[in-house]
Amino acid sequence: MLILGLTGSIGMGKSTTSKMFQDEGVPVYDADAAVHALYASGGAAVAPVETAFPGVVVDGAIDRAKLSAQVVGNSEALAKLEAIVHPLVGAHRIGFFEQAKAEGHEIVVLDIPLLFETGGEKRVDKVVVVSAPAEVQRERVLARPEMTPEKFEAILARQTPDADKRARADFVIDTGQGLDHARRQVRDLLTLLRTARSA
């Protein structure tokens, strides 16, 4: 089974591209969604995180703002949180792989926003970077509610620059020319990979 790592900076269209892979029948593992599920009421992270960070659970779920207040800017607290969450996400991901394999899928996608920043490229076979021109990215991001130019710049400062991501990618999906163009690229990429696997 071929594992594709899908990543891209904020506003590049990664979520939309991820959905395009799903529409083509490729299972997609969404790392952010996995963490949300772990933090939700009944999630496996709720009890251990509350033990480590008392007061962060509200109505049976982890309140991300309260957790953030205890963790941001505190590398020791962040390391403690990661020691709880990362193994749970890892177990969740293994379950995803096992199910995809049992269903006979040849290709799966791991949707990981900070793929390069967390060393995730070592866990995948090929890296797909979603990209768009900087002015398109800026326009998309600043159209979001609650977003300011300052917030946008702060987010960019924490992410690997787009040019670096593209240079390290095996494949690039350009979303700057519209959805149909991006969808064609996704289909062409899957055709290429499936042909290579059956050759």
UniProtKB/Swiss-Prot annotation:
Enzyme Commission numbers on file: 2.7.1.24
Key words of the record: ATP-binding, Coenzyme A biosynthesis, Cytoplasm, Kinase, Nucleotide-binding, Transferase
Keyword flag Transferase: yes
Domain DPCK: 3-199
Keyword field contains Transferase: yes
Binding site for ATP: G11, M12, G13, K14, S15, T16
Pfam families: CoaE (PF01121)
Main localization of the protein described in the UniProt heading: cytoplasm
PROSITE patterns: DPCK
Cellular component terms per the entry's GO annotation: cytoplasm
Subcellular location, record wording: Cytoplasm
CDD domains: DPCK (cd02022)
EC class of the enzyme, as a word: transferase
Pathway in which the depicted protein is active: Cofactor biosynthesis; coenzyme A biosynthesis; CoA from (R)-pantothenate: step 5/5
Primary role: Catalyzes the phosphorylation of the 3'-hydroxyl group of dephosphocoenzyme A to form coenzyme A.
Protein name: Dephospho-CoA kinase
Species the sequence originates in: Caulobacter vibrioides (strain ATCC 19089 / CIP 103742 / CB 15) (Caulobacter crescentus)
